[in-house]
Amino acid sequence: KGCKPLTYCPQGYNEVWSKWSSNASELETLKGLDPSISIYWTGADVNSPITQSTIDYVKEKSGHEACFWINYPVNEHAKSGIYLGDITYYARDGVTGMAGAVSNPSRFAESNKVGLFQLAALFWNNKNYSENAQTVWEDAFRYLEPEVEDSYFKIASNVSNCPHSSRIGNGFPESEYLKDTLASVLNKINSGAALKNDSEVESLISEMDKIVAAVADFKENCTNTKQVQELNPWLSSLNDVATGIKAILKSAQALQENDAEEAWTNFGTAAKALNMWNTYNTGDGTTKAEAGSKRLQPFLSEVTAYVKNNLTPLMDSSNTDFTPKFY
């Protein structure tokens, strides 16, 4: 009495678990509860989008409305990542019939705010949310850290995936604005197309400079010191991968121009960055931060392997195709 409304968490708090033999009759049994009680529900599985079908499912099976339990921005399923991206993986337009919604955050209190800002907007009004998702995401940085808004957004655009996730097989959106350019440049490299003065290659090199500058600006000028401390492992990882991409592209260009010294020097920079990329401890004693894991690091890894395979044979002193000035 006097405790309404209550929200109850069943053992089978998602569609998959509710169908296990041990939980098969649980939702049906819940029909006997007071009608005011809502049910904690994570959707089709443990970490799932908010869909109309799953909201209807729990209502039909239990007779109660769902209080949607969204497992975001918690990163327990992929601790090498920290989630600063948009929430389009979870958001669906116009879902009705929920009693409410709650977020399961990570232990990174300051970094959680990017996701929580967006979830608050979604929970307040989910009509046509997808049309406004990008704007809401960008607004978060202006609201949270206005003194480094642009730099924070640049960082977040490349630090949002959930690497090696046990729950989200295809990962979260990350580096989407570079997706086409990365693919095109990689194709040019593999096909032997001329790289010097290529507009896409130069654009990608310039973007890596901007990422490195954003990291430096954020570290120096963000007034939220706790935020900087939380993100520092991922900032170091992102700085490495951006530095590495710039260097390996310069190396590939030099390789085509028969400049062995330039090719080798930049290759060394890229290889070192690639080796350091996932060596920064996130604070739990074991897990290492992985920034740019969806597109940037795979690109760096593949181009580094390509340059190595083409550069190493030319370091043979008997080879006359190159004239290494450092001999």
What are these regions (language model features)?
Residues 1-136:
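Catalytic-core regions of glycoside hydrolase
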Residues 133-326:
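Catalytic domains of carbohydrate-active enzymes that cleave complex glycans
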